[in-house]
Amino acid sequence: MNARENPFATDRTQRILTFRPEWANTSMSELTAQWEKLNRRAEILGRHDSGKSTLLTSWEQWLAENNQPVIHIFLNREHRNISDSQWQQLTESQGKIILLDGEEQLSWRQRRKFYQLSTNAHGLLITRHKSGSLPTLCNLDPNIQILHHCIKEVSPENYQELAPHLPEWWKKYQGNIREILLECYDAMK
């Protein structure tokens, strides 16, 4: 099978695997109601590749559908700093929702500046690996059942072939679903 036909190609899995609240035993209406109770300032917790960014992307789509202006900032190990243009956007955050993916990447000084600038925002939702200064909206903890859902969603026709390997891969990659999807890609070559 060539790369273009592989059902587990990264661009395809990212397109297909959007956040499914029911897989986390919740609903979007429950999450939004909880966010409102937390005064629209909360954090999404979870280990690396647990679905935090996927949830944040779904949240951004939901906000866009409801005509809510958004400032979305993505940080990771390779990109740890907020850019000058993003800092400028944050100075104009009143009435906007700020989504910060990877808050723990910021230095103490940057974090302090970020929270000062986000005070007047209409809402704030961040992702972290461990609890920080905001109340927790949800803690994503993937399990092997979610992995099975993902495989069935991406490639139902290959599920029976891949299913026997999933427990082994789950252990090998310590529950990192993204890495297991790459393993599925290799298995389909």
Predicted regions and their residues:
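Walker A/P-loop nucleotide-binding motif
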Residues: 38-58
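Conserved P-loop NTPase "ATPase switch" module shared by AAA+ and STAND
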Residues: 73-77, 87-111
